[in-house]
């Protein structure tokens, strides 16, 4: 389990995260939701150690990630898979080379083993046959699936996704949501997703943390989102595409 205890983060005089305490459940699809500028990305970057909190603790199974040595943090990050807003693929590498890249860098596997593992991950995201294509030759949705395959190639315990549906059409977004949800269950990964897409929230959200102006306003599951008595959350929900007339 990931526990966040009284996290603050400031940039100069601007306080971006304000006393956030929450938990992210093991083997579940955890969503951090909120409008743009709410602090979602700053919180996620703090969780993975790309930013140091001004104050507070981030605990992985009871171990304080913030106070770990540099060496221990590096080892800890190898248990994390990451998917960014853009697919962040290497244009000069083929699809299978992109997926294999973490193994090439950090594993002791033979080339044949690395290639086989990369192929397994591509098959899992339904990209069999695209191995030798380059990122510029495939669609944005396919690029996101390559990014997912790369993120899970080293069998991470935690999967962090920053706006994985950014720039995608609704149909493709649904495919990505379903893929992340099924991989979470199949591999028993603890998945944390930043999003402001209420379709994702209502589709795959098992543990939902709502952030507004750097503060945690509400936490629950998708079944209780609509019935929430939190006015700020209600405003976000009813302003979304879920309730817009066609």
Question: At which residue positions do the language-model features occur?
Answer:
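Helix-to-loop junction immediately C-terminal to a conserved catalytic motif
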Residues: 48
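Conserved ABC ATPase "signature" region
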Residues: 111-129
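A short, proline-enriched helix->beta-strand linker immediately N-terminal to the Walker B motif
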Residues: 153-157
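Helix N-cap at the start of a conserved alpha-helix in ABC-type nucleotide-binding domains
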Residues: 170-172
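Conserved ABC ATPase signature
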Residues: 134-138, 142
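Catalytic Walker B motif of ABC-type/P-loop ATPase nucleotide-binding domains
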Residues: 159-162
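Conserved ABC transporter NBD signature motif
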Residues: 56-64
